């Protein structure tokens, strides 16, 4: 196991970008017993959310394949915190079935985002299509300052 990230291998998209999703993880190769990982956080730890700001709104997109809209909650808490959560139930086992591989996640996930002051928290809209949740938080219009021209005498 190397403690130095490889700059010429792997999936790193840009070694100089501090926000790259493919950043080196020093704990990646550590084996953690499953009993020590919280059941609530273990299921969708990799639930990825994109947040972009347009001139009109803050737009959040989350990939949550296999979930129905009834299994997902979008809430505003503490006035400015957007919370996206959901749960995928474990598939029921039949004694006559033989499982060869179980790779799909089950359990709960929660993601929270502190919204900026310009967010209209009373006008949030959410939709889900093809396993992608889109949450749109409109922004307040930036008020342009009133400018009054002053005539110069003399």
Swiss-Prot record:
- GO molecular function list: unfolded protein binding
What domain of life?
Eukaryota
Q: Which UniProt keywords apply?
A: Cytoplasm, Stress response
What are the record's GO terms for cellular component? cytoplasm
Question: Which residue ranges does the record assign to the sHSP domain?
Answer: 40-154
InterPro entries per the UniProt record, alphabetical? A-crystallin/Hsp20_dom, HSP20-like_chaperone, Small_HSP
- A Pfam entry, by short name: HSP20
Specify where it is mainly localized.
cytoplasm
Q: Name one GO biological process term.
A: response to salt stress
Q: Where in the cell is it found?
A: Cytoplasm
Write out the similarity annotation. Answer: Belongs to the small heat shock protein (HSP20) family.
Q: How does it associate, per the subunit comment?
A: Forms oligomeric structures.
What's the name of the protein?
17.5 kDa class I heat shock protein
Q: Which gene encodes it?
A: HSP17.5-E
